């Protein structure tokens, strides 16, 4: 949504294709982008956070999309200000990508502790790959944890179906 809404700013990647895949995954194809230095990425994020004139339109689009995500998605996370999310297009311009994410630690704690809530909030067809995603900030899953979560969700699905 952000890439389409903010395309006119040229501060987001050019979206070549986007498809919602079976099982709750998405495939996003965008223009080729190159990494920038950590300092340059952090500076771009600071300019967005400060609503500097050069990025004010982009910041407004980010706010709109982020607010919608928070309304529509349980366990919506804060904006990701990782400097690695700032990249450079072939034409030299800076773009920001991958700003939105789920609050993984809270989400997966709920999967473990209250799988019935997850089953109510996320239909089965949208969470097929839920336990296949890594937790970027905390590494991989402890041995057997993903399997225990899958079993807990399957049992909650059976309870919901009656």
Language-model features, listed with the residues they occupy:
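C-lobe/activation-segment region of protein kinase-like
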Residues: 50-79, 89-162
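Conserved protein-kinase catalytic-loop position immediately C-terminal to the HRD catalytic Asp
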Residues: 84-85
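Conserved structural core of kinase catalytic domains
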Residues: 7-62
